[in-house]
Regions:
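Sec-dependent signal peptide recognition
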Residues: 2-11
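Hydrophobic h-region of N-terminal signal peptides that target proteins for export
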Residues: 11-19
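Short, polar loop/linker segments at the starts of domains and inter-domain junctions
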Residues: 27-29, 48-69, 198-206
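Short loop/turn microsegments at loop-to-beta-strand junctions
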Residues: 36, 154-155, 207-211
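Active-site/binding-pocket entry motifs
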Residues: 45-54, 182, 191-196
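Active-site microenvironments of metalloenzymes and redox enzymes
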Residues: 48-57, 68-178, 187
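Short, well-ordered junction/capping motifs at the entry into regular secondary structure
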Residues: 187-213
Length: 213
């Protein structure tokens, strides 16, 4: 699996736990216009990692081994600043439903476990609206998922490494989900050669066979 496709990271990948309904759904965020589009990922078994002979192979991609994955949902796009900034500001927390699925929801936090304002403007002037949230720590991404779970009443988390690769492969066995030819990468992803040294709004390229961007 060529690692060029794995550079879209952070809080993009979320998992709800409200039943195996095999279809896409849209998660609305109470009190806002924001939403998260979710894609159903069917369960299955795949070969994780890549062969040493594969172009672009990294040493940590082996040895190859079989992994069984249960069905789950994954975000169609990366999480954008539009939503992540709401988590950091916490201004909409009071608008969340007081009860969800018959259970009290508590997202009270302290100064350690809550989000903290970044030390600099993290988009670095490249754009915010519709752009993927970047440069947070893994802990911040985990806390975002906890916040989103409390706000919506559905369980969200980051994907495991195996779930991430499985979803990126989308049932294929080639270096990329679209084949082995890196010349086609421009159609599906931004990278050093076509990004102009900046990041871009989500959903601007073609999705993989399972509908993930």
């Amino acid at each position: 699996m060529n690692q060029s496709i794995l550079k879209i990271v952070l809080v993009a990948l979320l998992l709800p736990s409200f039943g195996d309904i095999e279809k896409e759904y849209i998660q609305s965020i109470p009190g806002t216009k924001e939403k998260v589009e979710m894609v159903f990922i069917p369960g299955g078994t795949f070969t994780m990692g890549s062969e040493k002979s594969e172009q672009g192979h990294f040493g940590d991609e082996g040895p190859q081994h079989q992994v069984e994955i249960n069905p789950f949902w994954m975000g169609k796009f990366e999480i954008t600043w539009d939503l992540y900034d709401l988590f950091v500001a916490r201004d909409i927390d009071r608008k969340r439903p007081q009860q969800l699925n018959g259970k009290e929801v508590d997202i009270d936090i302290d100064g350690v476990s809550g989000a903290t304002q970044p030390y600099t403007e993290m988009s670095f002037g490249m754009g915010v609206e519709g752009y993927p949230a970047i440069c947070m720590t893994q802990l911040a991404a985990v806390k975002f998922c906890e916040w989103l779970s409390a706000m919506t009443g559905n369980f969200y988390r980051l994907p495991t490494e195996a779930e991430w690769e499985y979803a990126c492969r989308a049932g294929t066995k080639t270096a990329y989900s679209f084949g082995d030819d890196p010349a086609d990468l421009d159609i599906y992803a931004w990278h050093e050669g076509n990004s102009g040294g900046a990041y871009h709004q989500v959903g601007q390229k073609k999705p993989n066979p399972w509908g993930l961007y």
